[in-house]
Amino acid sequence: MNMKLKAYFYYDIISPYVYLFLKSRKILEDKLELIPVPIFFPGLLRLQENTGPAEVPEKRIYTYQFCVWKAQKLNLPFQLPRRHPFASAPAQRILLQNNADLAMLDKAFDFVWGQGHDPELEWEDFCVAIGLSKNTPKPQDEKIKKALIESTQTAAHHGVFGVPSIRIDQQVFWGVDSIDWILEYLNKPEMFSEKEFQIAHSIINPLLEK
């Protein structure tokens, strides 16, 4: 029996795209060992001086409507929370603290994006949904807080700039629509060594020129 290739799956419950990815992952699990890695998406944006979709009004609406459309195409339950973005750090910390596997992530993301709940304001119900006691407190352990920060910094170091992202060796794939690309890469691992792909590294960026 061949061992599956390890693939690191970077996520934050703040993103509806991660929900769509989780629901579409089966075809990847046949070939990859998906290893969940919780990060703090707002922190990742700050590290890279980037702007999230929620900070651009038109992009925010587009994101929500695209996810509604995509979920319908995939025949998935999908409901937007009444407020977004919510503070995702407590949820990410509790998932990290419990070494959340894909089964726990399914429960967490179903609660938020399948049912439209707010994990920040509905903390007790969120904990129950993922199999914990409703009396589970929001993590305050400095080690857990530090671990999430370090996980985010490590993700940035590996070139992760958004969620969901999949890292195979040193190659990062971003977004739910990258699944087909990942599958092609697995069949053709030399893909990024080809001239057509290498050219991307040599394109001059006038915005960075002094």
List each language-model region with its residue ranges.
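Short, Lys/Arg-enriched N-terminal segments with co-localized hydrophobic residues
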Residues: 1-2
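C-terminal cap of thioredoxin/glutaredoxin-like
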Residues: 5-8, 14, 18-32, 107-210
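Structural alpha/beta surface segment adjacent to cysteine/selenocysteine redox centers
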Residues: 13, 17-112, 196-210
